[in-house]
Amino acid sequence: MAVSFNTTLHQPSLSPSCSIKLYSGLKPQSASFLASGYQNLNKEFYGRVYKSLQSGTGKASRSRVKMMPIGTPRVPYRNREEGTWQWVDIWNALYRERVIFIGQNIDEEFSNQILATMLYLDTLDDSRRIYMYLNGPGGDLTPSLAIYDTMKSLKSPVGTHCVGLAYNLAGFLLAAGEKGHRFAMPLSRIALQSPAGAARGQADDIQNEAKELSRIRDYLFNELAKNTGQPAERVFKDLSRVKRFNAEEAIEYGLIDKIVRPPRIKEDAPRQDESAGLG
């Protein structure tokens, strides 16, 4: 005896008490919007989002959607080839504009990310400048030297900008930028010193580590002398201990070329020479 079962699948209905709202563009849609599927997010949609973000009035409005993501901020970015807008994280947007931001301790993982980004941008267009923004304490010796050597090996010119602090090897990278394109903000602080190590083990191991550290120190100081125009003897003497610079002192020493002054304070800010101006 054959027994057949007739079953009917019913899609669950949405209760109005759920208060579900979906947004298409900048206007709220009813829950029935689910039945028709999501609309195609095209150029017009992203254009409305971008215009909304640009012309926000700050007034409370139920129909206005303010996207405030948790974690890495996302921004609208226009694809130049396709002419469409899309949401990307802020670091991705900066990379696409050839901007590299170093705002943390430089370790092996972070250094590899910076190296890969610089090499990729150089292969895309080696005639356009890469902009490196620095606001960090420096980092490990070998990863920082890898960034320096890569900067010098690229065909693309690399400009450097200090937007807060550039300590130790971050200051060394700041001075390694293209001449004429090394900038700092008025309140930037730069500190340089001799590289340090923490050798442990047998006496021979410690001695070998000290020799290697001295070799790297000599290389760093000689390169810094070339980049700043200072005599090597002065660099060795000045950096035997921590030496700190403000923006004006960094210009005098040759670490940077100009001080970037925002337009709102450009007229009121004191200037000591012609090189201090809007970058």
Swiss-Prot record:
Q: Which UniProt keywords apply?
A: Chloroplast, Plastid, Transit peptide
Query: Mind telling me which InterPro entries this protein's record contains?
Result: ClpP, ClpP/crotonase-like_dom_sf, ClpP/TepA
What do we know about what induces or represses this protein's expression? Repressed in darkness.
Q: Which SUPFAM superfamilies match?
A: ClpP/crotonase
Which effects follow disruption of this gene?
Embryo lethal. Delayed embryogenesis and albino embryos, with seedling development blocked in the cotyledon stage. Under heterotrophic growth conditions, seedlings develop into small albino to virescent seedlings.
Transit peptide boundaries: 1-54
Its subcellular locations are: Plastid, Chloroplast
How does the annotation summarize its subunit structure?
Component of the chloroplastic Clp protease core complex which consist of at least 16 proteins: CLPP4 (3 copies), CLPP5 (3 copies), CLPR4 (2 copies), ClpP1 (1 copy), CLPP6 (1 copy), CLPR2 (1 copy), CLPT1 (1 copy), CLPT2 (1 copy) and 3 copies of CLPP3 and/or CLPR1 and/or CLPR3. The core complex is organized in two heptameric rings, one containing CLPP3,4,5,6 in a 1:2:3:1 ratio and the other CLPP1 and CLPR1,2,3,4 in a 3:1:1:1:1 ratio.
What the record says about family reads:
Belongs to the peptidase S14 family.
| Protein name (record) | ATP-dependent Clp protease proteolytic subunit-related protein 2, chloroplastic
- What is the scientific name of the source organism? Arabidopsis thaliana
Species lineage: Eukaryota, Viridiplantae, Streptophyta, Embryophyta, Tracheophyta
